[in-house]
């Protein structure tokens, strides 16, 4: 049974309250590094990405540098990450697209971001919200799992349905905080196996609604 909008908002706001200082866990110093790091994070932990990116960014600090590298040269820096050969191919192509289509700058709109090789809706939403402060809500595995476990969405909901539901429940200024807090909540409490959410009764207390 999916929660009402009021109850779902209560759950999300309680999760934000549990992790009010949640920040992005990927390391980056500019928009290009953020884009690359988020692309690398697919099916890989942020911790693993953060171990790989210092060497990668030192070797290829700009789209220009990455575009002229070979796929093997890029792959050698990310070989411990999942799907690293595909990611190397996407990074090289994406870097060239940034030069050809966007004067070497990372674009700010979802349509433009999703035109880049290897960039899907989730990556675009992270770059928009974290990199540019543009309201967007990214759905990763933690967010999807939490929303289904807590009946914010139906169990069969797609990532896009999760995204639209949360954006309908919370005001835009809370979307990024909710995304960050849910990642921390998913890692620390709402595990895929043996979630510990029941230790936080405020998540289930709707007596004041």
Map each language-model feature to its residues.
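Catalytic cores of DNA base-excision repair glycosylases
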Residues: 2-209
């Amino acid at each position: 049974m999916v929660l009402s909008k009021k109850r779902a908002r209560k759950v999300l706001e309680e999760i934000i309250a549990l992790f009010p200082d949640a920040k992005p866990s990927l390391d980056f110093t500019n928009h290009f590094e953020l884009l690359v790091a988020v692309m690398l994070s697919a099916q890989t932990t942020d911790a693993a990405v953060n171990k790989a990116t210092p060497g990668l960014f030192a070797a290829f600090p700009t789209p220009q540098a990455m575009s002229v590298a070979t796929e093997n040269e890029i792959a050698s820096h990310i070989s411990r990450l999942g799907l690293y050969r595909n990611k190397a191919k996407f990074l090289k192509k994406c870097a060239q697209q940034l030069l050809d289509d966007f004067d070497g700058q990372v674009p700010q709109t979802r349509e433009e971001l999703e035109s880049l090789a290897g960039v899907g809706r989730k990556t675009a939403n992270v770059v928009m919200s974290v990199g540019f402060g543009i309201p967007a809500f990214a759905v990763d595995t933690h967010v999807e799992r939490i929303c289904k476990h807590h009946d914010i969405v139906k169990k069969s909901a797609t990532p896009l349905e999760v995204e639209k539901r949360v954006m309908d429940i919370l005001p835009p200024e809370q979307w990024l905080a909710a995304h960050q807090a849910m990642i921390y909540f998913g890692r620390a409490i709402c595990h895929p196996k043996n979630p510990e959410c029941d230790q936080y009764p405020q998540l289930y207390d709707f007596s004041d609604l």
